[in-house]
Amino acid sequence: MTNSPRTAAIIVAAGRGLRAGAGGPKQYRTLAGRPVIARAMEPFCTHPGVMAVQPVTNPDDTEMFNAAVAGLNFRPAVGGGATRQASVRAGLEALAELKPDIVLIHDAARCFVTPELISRAITAAGATGAALPVVAVTDTIKQVDSSGAVDATPDRASLRIAQTPQAFRFDVILDAHRRAASGGRDDFTDDAAIAEWAGLTVSTFEGDANNMKMTTPEDFAREESRLMAALGDIRTGTGYDVHAFGEGDHVWLCGLKVPHTRGFLAHSDGDVGLHALVDAILGALADGDIGSHFPPTDPQWKGAASDKFLKYAIDRVTARGGRVANLEVTMICERPKIGPLRDAMRQRIAEITGVPVSRVAVKATTSEKLGFTGREEGIAATASATIRLPWGADGLAG
């Protein structure tokens, strides 16, 4: 084995997560505004020691998966099987063409994995060939019989809680999985157990107490509260945009194509509502304005759809570990009338940003026939955005 083994990772995300309650598969639910699976995958996708990340998903979840992990770098997902064991084997077979030295197998529901834990996994597998992260048992454990009566009290000094990523030499764990499948064994709950069954010695290395598996509604409630408490740096920004009317038969407003007697004079699609929101978000980040990120002199933005700009602004918040808490936009115009479109506009902004519609407000007013909007020469919009960033991002104490 070389000092720098060629390492790949499998992210197991084909389960349904029924114990987590309503809301769909748990790996696609959000924590502090970010999908669990994105939190679980990103440390592998960005780790310098991991050359490839292979997701294994349920084919029914393709749309959710693509939306949740947009922007990350990974191999095309493969479909999972009826059991976790079958899903892992599908991931291993998909990686066989790469012939990695080491493979890390990680559950998507463990979304607090750290780069340090990944590095320890790679080192352990390189040294022993098969290893898993563990943490000590701190509670007293009781073994009970079928009636629920205590049958024994094991010595917790020798007990450990298994975690992922579990790490193996690729060739040996692929062989073990193939042998188990051909032997009709499909009841293993983790990959270390398959390695043990195949006669391999499995070593352990230091896990991480925070590397918990999201399983129950209580897990989600607790971790949501913890993460939101850490996002205590609350910031606000405001934005303003205006566009004059020109020739055309429609205008774009808050992501909707609205029939109108005139169009906008604009370099992009001229959506004043979304442009104002972009400026508000960038202002909250102290990150310039829409013109500095998307110069009107740049031909690539000619006729561009403004939802791209808004998604970009949201990504800037996410990249700093934050989330958007509230968005508000006020349209200033005589026509078209905004009232009948208000709910559809709110829904469209929510779709673009991933912000719950209950945190998106669209309002409208006129200038009482005064000024350019009163003369129906164009439309203006103002916006505000409230975001939450982690304490310490700019050297401030929490």
UniProtKB/Swiss-Prot annotation:
Annotated positions binding 4-CDP-2-C-methyl-D-erythritol 2-phosphate: D241, V242, H243, H267, S268, D289, I290, G291, T365, T366, S367, E368, F372, R375
Feature type site, description Positions MEP for the nucleophilic attack: R156, K213
Site, as annotated: Transition state stabilizer: R19, K26, H267, T366
Sorted UniProt keywords: Isoprene biosynthesis, Lyase, Metal-binding, Multifunctional enzyme, Nucleotidyltransferase, Transferase
Pfam families xrefs: IspD, YgbB
Gene Ontology MF: a single term: metal ion binding
Cofactor(s) listed: a divalent metal cation
Recorded metabolic or biological pathway in which this protein acts: Isoprenoid biosynthesis; isopentenyl diphosphate biosynthesis via DXP pathway; isopentenyl diphosphate from 1-deoxy-D-xylulose 5-phosphate: step 2/6; Isoprenoid biosynthesis; isopentenyl diphosphate biosynthesis via DXP pathway; isopentenyl diphosphate from 1-deoxy-D-xylulose 5-phosphate: step 4/6
Source domain of life: Bacteria
Entry's transmembrane regions: none
Biological process terms in GO annotation: isopentenyl diphosphate biosynthetic process, methylerythritol 4-phosphate pathway; terpenoid biosynthetic process
Residue segments, region 2-C-methyl-D-erythritol 4-phosphate cytidylyltransferase: 1-234
Chemical reaction(s) catalysed: 2-C-methyl-D-erythritol 4-phosphate + CTP + H(+) = 4-CDP-2-C-methyl-D-erythritol + diphosphate; 4-CDP-2-C-methyl-D-erythritol 2-phosphate = 2-C-methyl-D-erythritol 2,4-cyclic diphosphate + CMP
Keyword Metal-binding: yes
Region span, 2-C-methyl-D-erythritol 2,4-cyclodiphosphate synthase: 235-398
Positions contributing to a divalent metal cation binding: D241, H243, H275
Protein's organism: Rhodopseudomonas palustris (strain TIE-1)
HAMAP family for the chain: IspD, IspDF, IspF
Gene3D superfamilies according to UniProt: 2-C-methyl-D-erythritol 2,4-cyclodiphosphate synthase, Spore Coat Polysaccharide Biosynthesis Protein SpsA, Chain A
Family: In the N-terminal section; belongs to the IspD/TarI cytidylyltransferase family. IspD subfamily.
Function statement: Bifunctional enzyme that catalyzes the formation of 4-diphosphocytidyl-2-C-methyl-D-erythritol from CTP and 2-C-methyl-D-erythritol 4-phosphate (MEP) (IspD), and catalyzes the conversion of 4-diphosphocytidyl-2-C-methyl-D-erythritol 2-phosphate (CDP-ME2P) to 2-C-methyl-D-erythritol 2,4-cyclodiphosphate (ME-CPP) with a corresponding release of cytidine 5-monophosphate (CMP) (IspF).
E.C. numbers: 2.7.7.60, 4.6.1.12
Protein's UniProt name: Bifunctional enzyme IspD/IspF
